Amino acid sequence: MNYPKELAYPIQESSKAFPLEGFVPGQGPLDPQIMIVGEAPGRTEVENFIPFSGQAGKELIKSLALAGLTREDVYITSAVRSRPYHTKERINKRTGAHEIVHPNRTPTKKEVMLHAPLLDYEIEQIDPPIIVTVGNIGLQRLLGNKIVIKNYHGQLIQSPIQQSDSEGSGYHWTNKPYQIVPMYHPAAIFYNRTLAETIEKDWRGLTKFLMPSTTHDKPGSSARKQ
């Protein structure tokens, strides 16, 4: 998506004060069957500017197929548009030399807040029939910090969502309810193989929410605003 310069430029400039690199816009059709909201780009994504194009992206494509979807059917974005990293020193196991590396990390609440207007803009422009959050960061960006994936994964939630306020210092709730289906992050399977069956079941179950009657008026479980 092409963002208005007056929206994106200040965020990109402010991001320089944080350990963030690159900038990966959301990508996909403007009339998608679902919008996917992830956490943040990784190293691969900031190199090729394609969201979910690394190892987690391969798992996401497999999951989409379980719901009868392809990448071309969905709009993909994230709570933070730049790669969060931290700096650490380690010994190279092959050479024995000390080296400085910059692995991925989870974005902070301040970083999510900084990038919040971009996601607000995308949701406003696309008005997705269903928002699928993958992982806790995207879920909590929309529904508050007290809601966790383990309690809601695979369920249809109908609720207002958080939008950034005009000062960029906090959130307010939309008047309009949206339909959100939380899913485990595709990378979760790399760290906990026992989630494989649950992830498959949740994505197969997504198909029942993709019918035309679910665009914005189908009741789902509700999550209280936090």
Give residue ranges: language-model regions:
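A polyanion-binding, active-site-adjacent surface
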Residues: 1-217
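Short, flexible loop/turn segments with low-complexity composition
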Residues: 214-226
